[in-house]
């Protein structure tokens, strides 16, 4: 697991591509997910992109998503709730390949879901990267500022 930590601002280009910060690319290159050699994930590696219920996008390395995918695959297609969860999870997921400049294409559907049209904030969150439209992230942070101590006290 890469251990992504930090916050960076980047812009979506006119073709809907997002530049993955170099320090994050180095992390997953060090972990073997993006070694520049041809693989099942393309020449320069790949990431799984997931729409989230809070309006952000989460980016996962294939090695991290593999464990989550196994858990989802283990759900029964004959149990209506488990089948629904599978459908909902895979409906909001795409795998994208990095190009040689370290960019990933984001579909119009995913950009619209996250309210992204230009600049983004990319948060390193240990095993994933979280992509936010800056004003949306600011709203979440400002709206939750008084809850940090209580949440940290409850879970740590």
Swiss-Prot record:
Q: Which GO terms describe its biological process?
A: negative regulation of DNA-templated transcription initiation
Coarse class of the protein's main subcellular location: cytoplasm
Could you tell me the superkingdom of the organism this chain comes from? Answer: Bacteria
Q: Which UniProt keywords apply?
A: Cytoplasm, DNA-binding, Repeat, Transcription, Transcription regulation
* GO molecular function per UniProt: DNA-binding transcription factor activity; transcription cis-regulatory region binding
Q: Which CDD domains match?
A: MraZ_C, MraZ_N
- Report the SUPFAM superfamilies cross-referenced here: AbrB/MazE/MraZ-like (SSF89447)
**Can you say where in the cell this protein is located?**
Cytoplasm, Nucleoid
Question: What region holds the SpoVT-AbrB domain?
Answer: 7-64, 93-136
* Gene Ontology CC annotations of this record: cytoplasm; nucleoid
Its assembly, as annotated, is: Forms oligomers.
- Report the sequence similarity comment from the record: Belongs to the MraZ family.
Query: Could you identify this protein by its name?
Result: Transcriptional regulator MraZ
Originating organism: Chlorobium phaeovibrioides (strain DSM 265 / 1930) (Prosthecochloris vibrioformis (strain DSM 265))
- Organism lineage string: Bacteria, Pseudomonadati, Chlorobiota, Chlorobiia, Chlorobiales
Q: Which gene encodes it?
A: mraZ
């Amino acid at each position: 697991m890469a251990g992504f930590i930090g916050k960076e601002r980047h812009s979506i280009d006119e073709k809907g591509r997002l530049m993955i910060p170099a320090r994050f690319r180095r992390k997953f290159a060090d972990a073997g997910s993006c070694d520049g050699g041809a693989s099942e994930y393309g020449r320069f590696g790949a990431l799984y992109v997931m729409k989230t219920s809070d309006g952000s996008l989460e980016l996962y390395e294939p090695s991290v998503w593999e464990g989550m995918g196994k858990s989802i695959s283990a759900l029964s297609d004959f149990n209506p709730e488990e089948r629904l969860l599978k459908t909902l999870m895979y409906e909001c997921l795409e795998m994208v390949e990095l190009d040689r400049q370290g960019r990933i294409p984001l579909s119009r559907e995913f950009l619209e879901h996250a309210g992204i049209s230009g600049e983004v904030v990319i948060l390193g969150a240990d095993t994933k990267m979280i992509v936010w439209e800056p004003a949306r992230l600011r709203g979440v942070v400002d709206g939750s500022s008084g809850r940090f101590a209580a949440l940290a006290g409850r879970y740590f």
